[in-house]
């Protein structure tokens, strides 16, 4: 009996020394699809290192004007994860769970739990017989570690922002090499400018990079508008970011220039929650809600909420 007690104590001691991870009490369940929903599409434009106070009429005229439209949800106070690395924040945006669940705590992605907390596209692929999910990124770890084999198409090598934009145009206009129903884009050069010169609306290199991205975003939005008007396609449009920045870094999680960023959601016929401040886990459930996909597993696992009313 004493030997048994000693063995149990040793086991408890070993377990207590391991890094604590949340216990997943959610079970896999059937994914349900609202069959009244058809022809819904989603474009997510991800801009790495977007400091909120750089969204001005002079620097980003298109996004500045978009933010005040009646059919847009916008906040400059969108909450990042407490861990302000890129890895944890893109992971939370794309899985709908906080970093202590998906266990991405830096940009190495070591110990990630995407098999338990997969990206939202996993549920779309489970619900729809035929859906084309795709991702084009400048920062390739998003495709390598988060998306892995979950999507139908991902860019295979690191691209610069101009190449991301051109590849997105090819997909959206030409349907080449795939005609996307749900498309995620990632622009990284703003973050690079911040690290090299400073994250600030007073830094010319940061400003010029953001102005260039604003032109890309306007062009992408116009393509979506044409698809809505000419082809009858029903697109939900997002602009999101992983973190802001201050000086040449974004490690101070207490700094509002770092732990707050922008979040846009636009649709001509939807209403969004007023006076609600989004966080990184709200993107995924909003998309699944719009696409008519639900399950007990999703409700159990995801920390965020849909901002669609």
Name each model-derived stretch.
Residues 14-42:
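Bacterial Sec-dependent N-terminal signal peptides
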Residues 53-89, 96-97:
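Short, structured active-site-proximal loop/turn typified by the sulfatase FGly-forming signature C/S-X-P-X-R
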């Amino acid at each position: 009996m004493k030997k048994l007690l000693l063995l149990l104590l040793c086991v408890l001691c070993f377990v207590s020394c391991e890094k604590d991870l949340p216990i997943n009490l959610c079970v896999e369940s059937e994914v349900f699809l609202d069959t009244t929903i058809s022809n819904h599409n989603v474009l997510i434009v991800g801009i790495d290192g977007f400091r909120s106070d750089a969204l001005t009429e002079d620097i980003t005229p298109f996004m500045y004007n978009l933010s005040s439209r009646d059919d847009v949800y916008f906040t400059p106070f969108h909450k990042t994860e407490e861990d302000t690395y890129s890895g944890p924040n893109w992971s939370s945006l794309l899985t709908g769970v906080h970093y202590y669940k998906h266990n991405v705590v830096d940009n190495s992605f070591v110990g990630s739990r995407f098999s338990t907390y997969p990206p939202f596209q996993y549920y779309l692929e489970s619900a729809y017989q035929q859906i084309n999910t795709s991702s084009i990124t400048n920062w390739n770890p998003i495709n390598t570690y988060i998306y892995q084999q979950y999507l139908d198409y991902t860019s295979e090598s690191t691209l610069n922002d101009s190449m991301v934009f051109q590849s997105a145009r090819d997909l959206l206009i030409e349907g080449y090499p795939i005609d996307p129903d749900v498309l995620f884009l990632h622009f990284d050069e703003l973050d690079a400018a911040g690290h090299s010169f400073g994250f600030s609306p007073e830094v010319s290199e940061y400003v010029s990079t953001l102005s260039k991205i604003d032109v890309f975003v306007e062009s992408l939005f116009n393509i979506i508008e044409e698809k809505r008007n000419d082809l009858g396609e029903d697109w939900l449009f997002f602009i999101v970011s992983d973190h802001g920045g201050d000086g040449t870094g974004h490690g101070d999680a207490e700094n509002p220039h770092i732990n707050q960023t922008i979040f846009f959601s636009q649709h001509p016929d939807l209403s969004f929650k007023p006076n609600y401040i989004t966080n990184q886990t709200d993107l995924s459930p909003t998309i699944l809600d719009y696409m008519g996909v639900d399950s007990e597993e999703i409700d159990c696992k995801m920390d965020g909420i849909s901002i669609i009313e």
